[in-house]
Amino acid sequence: MATAKPTFEEQLAQLQQIVNHLEQGNVPLEEALQQFQEGIKLSKELQTKLTNAEKTLGHLIDDNGDEKVYEKQTDDPSNNGGGNRGFGSADEQ
């Protein structure tokens, strides 16, 4: 019988526990390495879940039932926002 996969929130809580434990500084080296590796694994799994959720939310349906694809906003300095102010900008009034 397969066990249920932990939820995003459960994995995040587990990662937070690992970080808190390692930050205490009194963890034996072998245990610290094992926990660090587990933390990296959890971090990658959480990032994958976030990426998948972002892709899912990137496809929204408008009022007419048509799919609208929204591009991910980045911190890219080459996109200074000129003419592309995004949802809720003052230009939409």
From Swiss-Prot:
The keyword Hydrolase applies. This is Exodeoxyribonuclease 7 small subunit. Belongs to the XseB family. Bidirectionally degrades single-stranded DNA into large acid-insoluble oligonucleotides, which are then degraded further into small acid-soluble oligonucleotides. NCBIfam families: PRK00977.1-2, xseB. Its EC number is 3.1.11.6. InterPro entries: Exonuc_VII_S (IPR003761), Exonuc_VII_ssu_sf (IPR037004). Heterooligomer composed of large and small subunits. Disulfide bonds: none annotated. GO terms for biological process: DNA catabolic process. It is an enzyme of class 3 (hydrolase). One of its GO terms (molecular function) is exodeoxyribonuclease VII activity. Pfam families: Exonuc_VII_S (PF02609). It is found in: Cytoplasm. Residues 61-93 are annotated as: Disordered.
